[in-house]
Amino acid sequence: MLNKKSLPLFGIDVAILVGGLGTRLRGVVDDVPKPLAPVLGRPFLFYLLDRLALRGARSVTLCSGYMADFVQEKTGSEWMGMPIHHSVEKKPMGTAGDLALAKNFLQSERVLIMNGDTWFEPDFKAFAEAAEGSEFCVAAAQVPDASRYGTLEWGSDGRLISFKEKSDTHAPGSINAGVYFVSQNLLASLRVEPLSLERAVLPALTLERRVKVFRTDAPFLDIGIPQDYAAAADFFTQLEISPHSMFPDFSDMKEAAVKLGTCIVIFDHLGRILMERRSDCGWWGLPGGRVDAGETIIASALREVAEETGLQVEITGFLGLFSDPRRRTVRYPDNGDLRQLVDAALLASSIQGNLTTSSESLDLRWFSPDEVPLNTVPPVVEILRAACSQTRNTLLR
């Protein structure tokens, strides 16, 4: 069975800094905090939470201030099976002060910190490995024009040497992506007082050569200024994670019919998961479908797997019953029907057969958990989290 650590952020608590005023976006986005600015009709922060849930983060703490009640109302206390905590500053505390306020929620050996107005998707597994043994590890993003950020300089040992100031020269460079791994010891040393992580803590650690750099070419987006915010829609579209009309955000469910189905997590001998690229939306999901009249859940699962993948499988366990309407609402494109999915999730292993696509799938592929595509259908994410952490017999509402 799968090693739990195959999930790149398994056991990691994450802090997202969402307390800024967003003054540079005034006139473009005025009625919501910057991290909740809409992109393709959906709050920017939702994309970050989707990604962290998919990557297996143990929990997320939102460090807020400006319009904190609104942030809490929109995000709630759970996201696709991932707990969400809220830490609220009563007065401006700076980023380091905000983290100090949130310490009780951040208990993992290393804590991942990120800004709520940037998107950066490094190889989290490699990033975590690079951060081992260090107090502070900063991710360096490569951008075509580093003039507005300033750049990072590091030595052959991978330790940060200095920050170069912003310049008028429009040239590519390595910048601070605003994503960090911080040790529990360093986090514990922060005091609840106004203090900037970027302007005070990080420079002081740099002088003592205590900061490691993780360089990556992963895509980077900062929505802090109007022109970059305007580019966010194309950015997410190119990543194939723009919202799909098949998966509306939870709203009025009175018109929805409840559909009982199965969802099957099939592992191979390498611990990889079989996923199918759905023909109805182009996103990745798991084999499964409706339980027909006269069928048992097991019979339905075996039939759906055979029809959609060409495989014969052995059911090895019951993972849980998943029914949360906030993440399991689907509008089918062929007839417009709105359904709330209630899925019996089962574990299985392949016995025989050759992978064969069907009318319901564009592609079939085995993925290790840290390679699961970003454009995975929302109802599947919490099932994958449970399967990869070996959580069994759980009723998720």
Regions found by a protein language model. Name each.
Residues 3, 237-265, 335-336:
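Acidic, metal-coordinating catalytic segment for phosphate/diphosphate chemistry
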Residues 112, 119, 125-129, 144, ...:
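Catalytic-core segments of class I nucleotidyltransferases/pyrophosphorylases
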Residues 133-142:
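A short, conserved acidic/glycine-rich loop-to-beta-strand motif
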Residues 149, 177, 255, 261-262, ...:
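Short loop/turn microsegments at loop-to-beta-strand junctions
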Residues 160, 272-273, 355:
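Hydrophobic "anchor" residues
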Residues 291-315, 322-386, 396-397:
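Unchanged
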